[in-house]
Amino acid sequence: MTREFNQEVDWLVAGTGVGGLTGAVVAHELGAEVLVVESASVYGGTTAHSGGVAWIPGHHLQSLVGIEDSKEEGYQYLRSLIGDTVKEERLRAYADKADEMLQFMHKHSRVTYTPLPAYMDYYEEHQGAKHGGRSMCPGAFTLRQLGEEAAYLRRGPFEGLGMPFSMTVVESSSLMKMNLRSYLIGAKLMLRYWLDIPSRLK
């Protein structure tokens, strides 16, 4: 069955992963009329199945984790790792504007990120690599903030494993250590889930 749809907008976003929705937020805040389209019956894309970590070199929060980093070092790492397969202006744009994007989202959305001091760059042998602090962990986000739209959100990977809730990267890393702290975090997650009766009834 073919459905006709005709609407004129300033900014059309195809897909509801982190890239598309971030672009939609920016366009909306800049005054554009935005339309987001998604081919699936749920939104979130492959981002909904990821840990949500963002790699931001030279960000404004580096003092919180005691690192010294720069956008130039971030560019050097990308160039050393990727080589000539990506144009220089694209790599420069990412290294130079990633923190600007982060600050914009902190100001204009409910999304929050904190740096992970022990989350090192994957390829330490490359020029410009850092031992930690560039990877940013998204903060916990309750589905209640989404209202009725929560019913259409693609569920995360943990729910497919019989776990009816999601967790942050910090929480999941702590659980893997199998020590007293990990058991306490596991208990906190379960308690948070069971006490959140409104969300469980949806």
Question: Where are the language model's segments positioned?
Answer:
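A short, basic/flexible loop-to-alpha-helix module at the beginning of a structural domain
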Residues: 1-8
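Alpha-helix N-cap/helix-initiation motif
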Residues: 2, 16-17, 40
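General secondary-structure edge motif
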Residues: 7, 27, 34, 58, ...
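N-terminal Rossmann-like FAD-binding beta1-loop-alpha1 element of flavoenzymes
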Residues: 11-36
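Conserved N-terminal/central alpha/beta ligand/cofactor-binding core
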Residues: 39-202
